[in-house]
Curated annotation (Swiss-Prot):
Organism: Mus musculus
Region Disordered: start-end pairs: 1-23, 382-423
Function: Receptor for arginine vasopressin. The activity of this receptor is mediated by G proteins which activate a phosphatidyl-inositol-calcium second messenger system. Involved in social memory formation.
Transmembrane feature ranges: 53-76, 89-110, 126-147, 169-190, 221-241, 299-318, 337-356
Name the record gives this protein: Vasopressin V1a receptor
A Gene Ontology biological process term: negative regulation of transmission of nerve impulse
Highest classification ranks of the organism: Eukaryota, Metazoa, Chordata, Craniata, Vertebrata
Compositionally biased residues, Polar residues: 388-406
Chain's gene name: Avpr1a
Lipid attachment, kind S-palmitoyl cysteine: C370, C371
Length: 423
């Protein structure tokens, strides 16, 4: 898991790249005994027990990520409900997570199984490009999803100005930027042939950097582009969102307190031509429960992303900026698994979607004939929930003997809702 210190230095450690940012990546199952004197090319040995652990963890992550995100895509495709902008972002974030599974985790899994890269030079470059492309896509799709929630909460009027077109442009920009920013991988990585300690020839997919600053510049740039900058943007957006929600809640609380001394009839709303008029705060000043729910969901996704990827990038930066850092000192199961679990983020997201959007799980279950009993239970629960909402609506209607006068003021910042009542 080391980096080359010169233009053609070979890594003094491991070679199977589950670290897509590093030279040879991170098959940390390479034993320290495989190192030659003075950091010479490694011998052709590795810790097989640790290698088996890596393969097992990667295989589990791959299967869970593919099944989870495929289920979300199937549910979104089969849902009878009208799709929203949030569904569009969830669909593309699931596609980005599938890209992580197939372009990053799967090559790493195959590489750990074969130990050495077994393929031509062009395949080495393509694999390295797709590995980083998946990382960029997953991060940037999360950024545009959070930006959409920021616009919906803090600038609701803009959601009325071709929101679908803007959302698609944001998603297309995320995919395009991810592809472009990962193109340098083609020029950095290549298949390099070297001689191991026992005198035999071997080849692997490694990077070539300009000494002495090339490695640091590369890893710092990748860490900033994939992790640091997106996290700053995400934090800024959520700072504004939280402030806007806090201000909205405070305004509603003050409004209720100011109306506390008024009669129930006046608080409920006056009559006008047989209609019960109930003022409701305009969408400019109010935040719906649906928006709050999607904000909560996005916040949990962002938190999972930060928790999963932070150890990975900390070790990356530590390895290139600490001159005393030695990979063989940290090649143990705990360090290896911590870094491997970075891709666990792609496994978590589907379950977060289904937790916050219950109908996705219901629609997914209904897609499988073997799960009809579970689907019927979901349908019953959904019907009971609808009945409770209708009962609550009926109980909250104002009495027909409410009194008051109706006045339509064009200067009012409140919209008017008319509810027909019997007289």
């Amino acid at each position: 898991m080391s980096f080359p210190r010169g233009s053609h230095d070979l890594p003094a450690g491991n070679s199977s790249p589950w670290w897509p940012l590093t030279t040879e990546g991170a098959n940390s199952s390479r034993e320290a005994a495989g190192l030659g004197e003075g950091g010479s090319p490694p011998g052709d040995v590795r810790n097989e027990e640790l290698a088996k652990l890596e393969v097992t963890v990667l295989a589990v992550i791959f299967v869970v990520a593919v099944l989870g995100n495929s289920s979300v895509l199937l549910a979104l495709h089969r849902t009878p409900r009208k799709t929203s902008r949030m569904h569009l972002f969830i669909r593309h974030l699931s596609l980005a997570d599938l890209a992580v599974a197939f372009f990053q985790v799967l090559p790493q899994l195959c590489w750990d199984i074969t130990y050495r890269f077994r393929g031509p030079d062009w395949l080495c470059r393509v694999v390295k490009h797709l590995q980083v492309f998946a990382m960029f896509a997953s991060s940037y799709m999360l950024v545009v999803m959070t930006a959409d929630r920021y616009i919906a909460v803090c600038h609701p009027l803009k959601t009325l100005q071709q929101p679908a077109r803007r959302s698609r442009l944001m998603i297309a920009a995320s995919w395009g930027l991810s592809f472009v920013l990962s193109i340098p991988q083609y020029f950095i990585f290549s298949v390099i042939e070297f001689e191991v300690n026992n005198g035999t020839k071997a080849q692997d997919c490694w990077a070539t950097f300009i000494p002495p600053w090339g490695t640091r510049a590369y890893v710092t740039w990748m860490t900033s582009g994939v992790f640091v900058v997106p996290v700053i943007i995400l934090g800024t957006c959520y700072g504004f969102i939280c402030y806007h929600i806090w201000r909205n809640v405070r305004g509603k609380t003050a409004s209720r307190q100011s109306k506390g001394g008024k009669g129930s009839g006046e608080a409920a709303g006056p009559f006008h031509k047989g209609l019960l008029v109930t003022p409701c705060v305009s969408s400019v000043k109010s935040i719906s429960r649906a928006k709050i729910r999607t904000v909560k969901m996005t916040f949990v996704i962002v938190s999972a992303y930060i928790l999963c990827w932070t150890p990975f990038f900390i070790v990356q930066m530590w390895s290139v900026w600490d001159t005393n850092f030695v990979w063989t000192d940290s090649e143990n199961p705990s360090t290896t698994i911590t870094a491997l679990l970075a891709s666990l983020n792609s496994c978590c997201n589907p379950w977060i979607y289904m937790f916050f959007s219950g109908h996705l799980l219901q629609d997914c279950v209904q897609s499988f004939p073997c799960c009809q009993s579970i689907a019927q239970k979901f349908a019953k629960d959904d019907s009971d929930s609808m009945s409770r909402r209708q009962t609550s609506y009926s109980n909250n209607r104002s009495p027909t003997n409410s009194t008051g006068t109706w006045k339509d003021s064009p200067k009012s910042s409140k919209s008017i809702r008319f509810i027909p009542v019997s007289t």
